[in-house]
Amino acid sequence: MRVKLFQLRGMLSGSRIL
């Protein structure tokens, strides 16, 4: 549950860095 949210945030953050 919380892991999914964390993964989603990580993907968004990674895209922002790129």
Swiss-Prot record:
GO terms for biological process: positive regulation of miRNA transcription; regulation of root development. Expressed in the root endodermis. Keywords: Activator, Transcription, Transcription regulation. It comes from the Eukaryota. The keyword Transcription applies. Regulatory peptide encoded by the primary transcript (pri-miR165a) of the microRNA miR165a that enhances the accumulation of its corresponding mature miRNA. Acts as a transcriptional activator of its corresponding pri-miRNA. Addition of synthetic miPEP165a increases the abundance of miR165a, with consequent increase of root length. This is Peptide encoded by miPEP165a.
